[in-house]
Amino acid sequence: QPWVATIFDPANFDGFQRMAAAVERHDTRMIGQIWHVGRQQLWNPIIAPVGVSALPDAYSWSVPHVMTASDIAMIVEAFVTSAETLKRAGFSGVELHGGHGYLISQFMSPWSNIRDDEYGGDVAGRTRFVREIIAGIRAVCGPNFIVGLKMPGDERVKGGIVPAEAVARLRTIALQKVDLDRA
């Protein structure tokens, strides 16, 4: 998308570095937001979106390719690599965008995640994806690199995340030492 500055494009690295230096020069911290839209990918006749389960996106009605274990590992690694690149650019941390039906929230939601493997089922299973991302970022970027999480507190759909589940989910995720949360 031409209006989004992507950290995975090496051509953008210098711009991210200049931005971080300009902000941090004023004794403030620069936090980059990273995300994957999952099944919300804009429709493309050649490339199917990937998703947690074979459930259509509520807006495009496209049915995603269900992610395999190797797809999941590859995307976890992409999140970790993006965080590491932002750290090298001078950012103080990242916020994982798990709101608005993006991939992280697709994993966490009982409405969109009907998997019967280790990434589905109960709260522990549905938070496994984001917990693996956080653990990977901590391992690569260290304990002082800020890791935040934006996630839904109430999806307002039948069978979706409700406030009580959001609290249980946050307790499970907090064991990974998330520095900030925005619901």
Task: List the predicted regions and their residue ranges.
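Flavin-dependent oxidoreductase catalytic cores
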Residues: 1-183
